[in-house]
From Swiss-Prot:
NCBIfam families: hlyII. The keyword RNA-binding does not apply. It comes from the Bacteria. The keyword Oxidoreductase does not apply. Residues 1-29 form the signal peptide. This is Gamma-hemolysin component C. It comes from Staphylococcus aureus (strain COL). Keywords: Cytolysis, Hemolysis, Signal, Toxin, Virulence.
């Protein structure tokens, strides 16, 4: 369902406000306009768009925060990309064989933003660098005059006129920026390593997730139970990413942005084999990136004057 949430409330904030409380931020997200600074130097105008694709198993929840700063010679927009990407993990018989079962699972989740507008530039984004921690929390702050800065965590020291936080969980996965330039940024949240009953295993281990029941007819039984699968494999991923862009004032009234959520899928085969003595066991075989860029892309049109958001297309 498409939701276009229009703003109704006006708040006043002191010239140097402390870092925002993330719980309050999430509660009021996209439901207000904030006048920040003495004499209303900055106005934050908020919009939210929700788009869901059952075909791709993806929901995009995008917050658009327009920064109207009298002391900054450009328009600025903070895009917070949230929602859900289903894992789409499935189990099946490989080519109708009786002795080979397959598990298709997400090795990588993809999150990206792109624009082709010559008057728009990417100026900041979160997260940056490679992050291996299970819980990711960072802040993007804004100070009067067009100064965007990031803080390492929700407990970071410092003050901003306005701030936006990200927070997500990536157990057994790592986040890193795969591509970035003045018009786009692409993140990959990739499988890393897993604690199993037989010890720590790399995400590339051929026996990863292979189970212990070679005599079952159910493909699911050839692999470890749900209790041994991390959330990003069993159910899916809740992204929380930020990109900030600038726009040349007086140039174009509208700009288009493509936001992409998706996954790259690996396939693990569990093959029933027998020893010289007739005992059965399961042997793993891996196909890395068997299905790549299984992505849902939505094209949003941003109006810099009216602050309206329109959905212009989707795949």
């Amino acid at each position: 369902m498409l939701k276009n949430k229009i703003l109704t409330t006006t708040l006043s904030v002191s010239l140097l406000a402390p870092l925002a409380n993330p719980l309050l931020e999430n509660a009021k997200a996209a439901n207000d306009t904030e006048d920040i600074g003495k004499g209303s130097d900055i106005e934050i105008i908020k919009r939210t768009e929700d788009k869901t694709s059952n075909k791709w198993g993806v929901t995009q929840n995008i917050q658009f925060d327009f920064v109207k700063d009298k002391k900054y010679n450009k328009d600025a927009l903070i895009l917070k990309m949230q929602g859900f990407i289903s894992s789409r993990t499935t189990y099946y018989n490989y080519k109708k064989t009786n002795h080979v079962k397959a598990m298709r699972w997400p090795f990588q989740y993809n999150i990206g933003l792109k624009t082709n507008d010559k008057y728009v530039s990417l100026i900041n984004y979160l997260p940056k660098n490679k992050i291996e921690s299970t819980n990711v929390s960072q802040i993007l702050g804004y100070n009067i005059g067009g100064n965007f800065q990031s803080a390492p965590s929700l407990g970071g020291n410092g003050s901003f006129n306005y701030s936006k936080s990200i927070s997500y969980t990536q157990q057994n996965y790592v986040s890193e920026v795969e591509q970035q330039n003045s018009k786009s940024v692409l993140w990959g949240v990739k499988a890393n390593s897993f604690a199993t009953e037989s010890g720590q295993k790399s995400a590339f281990d051929s026996d990863l997730f292979v189970g212990y029941k070679p005599h079952s007819k159910d493909p699911r039984d050839y692999f470890v139970p749900d209790s041994e699968l991390p959330p990003l494999v069993q159910s899916g991923f809740n992204p929380s990413f930020i990109a900030t862009v600038s726009h040349e004032k007086g140039s174009s009234d509208t700009s288009e942005f493509e936001i992409t959520y998706g996954r790259n899928m690996d396939v693990t085969h569990a093959i029933k084999r027998s020893t010289h003595y007739g005992n059965s066991y399961l042997d793993g075989h891996r196909v890395h990136n068997a299905f790549v860029n299984r992505n849902y892309t939505v094209k949003y049109e941003v109006n810099w004057k009216t602050h309206e958001i329109k959905v212009k297309g989707q795949n």
